[in-house]
Amino acid sequence: MTMVNWVFFFGSALVLALILLHASVHKFRGRIDFQSALRGYGLFPERALILWWVVPLVELISVLEILFSVGESRFLAFLILSLYSALIFYNLIIGRTNLDCGCGGVGTKLSWWIFGRNTILLIFCISSSISGVVIEADHLFLCALGGITFGILLFASYLVFNQLLSNAQVLNGD
């Protein structure tokens, strides 16, 4: 695996882990807001909302899977992002765009931009789950530094993108 592939591989894994960790912490800290977002989707009976903690717990477990599987699996991250994308897609198709996505971070209503963002994250899940990563000792430091830098830059871009979406919705009066 070339150095560029290695940097992309670990950078995309790092950004997935950071995004899922951020979303999970946000859901645990703002459980009332998260329960409200789940309630807004209208797909779950009220009694099922007492199990709200399962979603951020699965996100935390997927972070551990990403960090400790070293390229073998991104199954949980792919599964949870696929479910989120399917829920968002379904609600966009039926015209229910006035819902908080419940994604983590600033309150953002459903939009095709959110769906597109999740699609890109799904691509990162696939591209970062290629097995057979071989780390060559003579390039280890440069690859690690590049992967960490790339992952942090992607995470910062993700946060900026979410903030821009939220600001655009406020400015447009949505």
Regions found by a protein language model. Name each.
Residues 1-172:
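Membrane-interfacial helix-loop segments of redox and metal-homeostasis proteins
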